[in-house]
Regions:
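Membrane-interface "cap" regions at the ends of multi-pass membrane proteins
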Residues: 1-50, 54-58, 71-72, 76, ...
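Extracellular loop-to-transmembrane helix junctions
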Residues: 34, 43-135, 139
Length: 549
């Protein structure tokens, strides 16, 4: 976005090897899909969802449905922009190019920080889940092994990382399938007690559980607590935008991947919220002990594993816990990948030190990877403070950062939409056109800002003030404001005028990429022989700094 560059692109057997940002396009469509699954499904869905269940099964389900609809609209907006301009860390680049350079600086660092914080979160959760089998496993050893494995997986060529993540994410799909079948079979009587319990657990103590206060007000507080859990759990579109620059077929691959987000939300998140409320009551003693008092050594931080033990189901709890470990590891692996790529995007834009742009011959931003792994060392805090306390700190920080990211994506889209109109660009010519625009984005923006502001409201109620919880809830929001204002003042940046927003940018390069690949595949099909090396020299219009107000 800062200066014009030229790009040399290689197409070998239908694969684009080089991209404008010097990463390599090795990720196949199935790998892109599974990287997104790996990043969006992990501890939050299988373990932390228990916090929402404590507020009532109905509260949990309604909260998940409402928030999933909002994030689906965020996906709708992000898909339109990313398929149009498929570059690595897309929404970070979009923020700088279409809104304000200070806006891109802020969201880049916000996304990097909360993604990097997710790494120790997953490692700490993995260590806690291991206590299902033994309490005496040394946490320091578990943490060290995780960090080493993450380093090895991410230091390999991207195509091997993608294949690794494909199989790890496949384990998550298997786990979700097992949990769904377990729910249905046991609720109709297929359990050791032969008890067809149906939806009985919804009434224990009730579909909406009182929290903080009594009566209807208490039940409303309970719903809000479940909504905060939904805000932490339901994620996904941003991970697709991060890998857009490394997809083999940037337009066709990303379009299909973004469309798949909708059924993932419905099946995984809403389905998971429904199932957990069926198999376990909100007032289960083990659930309350683990999540309220912070006891570990039960496994059982996962509500599904607790339900299996309550029904005296043999073997299956061990299988589920083993798959849960691979699920948590997979999520952490994806977070190392995404945080290193977001930091790389910052360095390319001049928002981080230039040395971070160094890549290996295989296209891995090696110094960015080292920085991401340094954050993993925060998981050693668990040795002094305990798993549950550290998870709570990290959860609050991560949720705040996630909400900031989605707010930025919505504002990016509103500026993008305004630029299309100002430059008389017909939206019907876009490779992907979102629905209900721009009204859906406005609704999502208002909802997300309300959740961000009121996320920690409970500490302002009489007798509930806690300065530690206050800072963990609001640090990311305050930090975003400080980052934006400081960079804007320091660099004297200005908002991009809609008529001057760069809507050309990398489009010619991407169009030529796709044309080169299509031609290569046609040659293979017609001649029935291995494709020869095709080299396409093209100039990339990564326009010099756009005129600004």
């Amino acid at each position: 976005m800062n200066s014009k560059t030229s790009e040399k692109t290689e197409v070998v057997n239908g694969e684009i090897l080089h991209t404008p940002d010097h990463l390599q396009r090795h990720l196949t469509p199935r790998q892109v899909q599974f990287v997104a699954i790996g990043g969006s499904i992990g501890t939050a869905l299988f373990v932390s969802i228990g916090y929402g269940l404590m507020r009532g099964a109905a509260s949990l389900l309604i909260a998940f449905v409402l928030h999933a609809l909002v994030i689906a609209q965020v996906n709708n907006s992000l898909a339109e922009m990313t398929v149009f301009m498929p570059i690595s860390a897309a929404f970070i680049h979009h923020a700088s190019a279409w809104v304000d350079d200070a806006w891109g600086f802020m969201i880049g660092w916000n996304f990097f920080l909360f993604e990097a914080l997710l790494i120790p979160f997953e490692i700490t959760a993995l260590d806690m889940v291991l206590t299902f089998w033994r309490d005496d496993i040394p946490s320091a050893a578990v943490i060290t092994v995780c960090i080493v494995l993450y380093a090895l997986c991410n230091a390999l060529m991207v195509k091997y990382f993608g294949e690794t993540e494909f199989w790890l994410a496949g384990g998550k799909l298997l786990l979700i399938g097992i949990l769904f079948f377990f729910t249905f079979i046991t609720m109709v009587g297929g359990n050791p007690q032969r008890d067809a319990y149906g939806f009985r657990n919804w009434s224990k103590p009730g579909p909406f559980v009182e929290y903080i206060d009594d009566g209807d007000l208490g039940r409303f507080h309970g719903f809000l607590a479940a909504l905060w859990q939904a805000a932490f759990t339901i994620v996904g579109p941003e991970y697709l935008a991060i890998v857009a620059g490394e997809a083999q077929r940037p337009r066709t691959t990303m379009k299909a991947a973004f469309k798949s987000v909708y059924w993932r939300f419905g099946l995984f998140f809403i389905g998971g919220a429904l199932c957990v409320g069926i198999v376990l009551p909100a007032n289960d003693p083990t659930l309350l002990n683990v999540l309220s008092s912070g006891e570990t050594g039960t496994g059982a931080a996962s509500p599904f594993v607790i339900a299996m033990k309550n029904m005296n189901v043999e073997v299956l709890p061990h299988l589920v816990n083993a798959l849960l470990l691979t699920s948590i590891y997979s999520a952490g692996n994806a977070y190392v990948y995404c945080s290193s790529r977001s930091l790389y995007g910052l360095a390319l834009n001049g928002h981080a030190p230039k040395f971070l742009t160094k890549c290996t011959k295989q296209g891995v931003p090696i110094y960015c990877l080292f920085v991401a792994l340094a954050f993993a060392c925060l998981s050693f805090l668990k040795l002094g403070s305990g798993s549950v306390k550290v998870l709570t700190w990290l959860t609050n920080l991560i949720t705040g950062g996630t909400l900031v990211t989605y707010i930025v994506i919505c504002i990016n889209y509103l500026f993008f939409y305004r630029a299309l109109k100002a430059q008389s660009f017909d939206r019907s010519d876009l490779p992907y056109r979102g629905y209900f625009q721009p009204y859906g984005t406005w609704v999502a923006l208002v909802w997300l800002m309300a959740v961000e502001i009121f996320y920690g409201y409970a500490i302002f109620l009489r007798g509930r003030w806690d300065i530690g919880i206050f800072f963990s809830n609001y640090t990311m929001g305050f930090l975003a404001i400080c980052l934006f204002c400081s960079w804007k003042i320091l660099k004297r940046t200005q908002f991009v005028r809609p008529e001057h927003a760069d809507l050309v940018w990398i489009r010619p390069a991407v169009d030529e990429h796709e044309a080169a690949m299509a031609g290569n595949e046609n040659e293979v099909g017609l001649r029935r022989r291995p494709a020869q090396l095709v080299r396409v020299d093209m100039k990339l219009s990564r326009a010099s700094r756009s005129p600004r107000v």
